[in-house]
């Protein structure tokens, strides 16, 4: 009897398990949406983004609006070329060590390429060597470096551009007078070349024009204004000023305005644009300024970087991005308007 009861209980248990299994199997169809959790299709854009080459761009900083224009050119070209562009720079153009630290930080990210505008043409050499050792192509832009590591340098011919400024000054002064020269620095390639281009041209072609300077204001408005005021105090007969970048010439304009000088007795020539210079040219306070192509510089450095990433090994030593002269008669011309920034 006991055996019969056990047999019956066992049969009931088997039946119950079978029933449970059947009941559990029923909702399987309702779990079909789980299959939609497979992330293959939705993750496709992530894979595309990960495949984009990462280009590090270390600029000279954001002290002047010039660099915002360069950044725009670089970022827009990066989008066009299918690259991720990280455009950075120190707070001022005197921050050499912070810029070197930024280089080291970008090196650790293992970028596909580096674009670099040096604040000090010599100081970056050891760090750039590390990029070369890691087989990361380097493109110099705006300010070159004293090194063979960069595959090319994308820049204005600053010697020729500053010589043009000297010619405009010499012609306006009738070949005689005294001109104060204020440059942003004597360590970057742009500072060195602009000072050389202006002074050499003036000395060669206009020997009766005396040069006061160059003196260096770090591209800072206040410092450059103080230098201009000191030059004027020590040289009552100064009748011209050349400022080698946006901040340098901006300081000159501030000094002349603050001292309430007779603007008709001064010829002021600058470099680059920005709203202050545009207004000064339109008002007649400033004769004119040499215009670089900042958007073109930014775009072209990304173009060259992408060529290197794709395996190109032969490059022109310099990619000349050109320059224009802007004065009251030409500032509204289409070609000049295309390179102005505010």
Spans of model-derived segments:
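A residue-level marker of the well-folded mature domains of exported/periplasmic proteins
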Residues: 6, 21-342
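Hydrophobic helical h-region of N-terminal Sec-dependent signal peptides
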Residues: 11-13
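Bacterial N-terminal signal peptides that target proteins for export
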Residues: 1-9
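C-terminal motif of bacterial Sec signal peptides marking the signal peptidase cleavage site
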Residues: 16-19
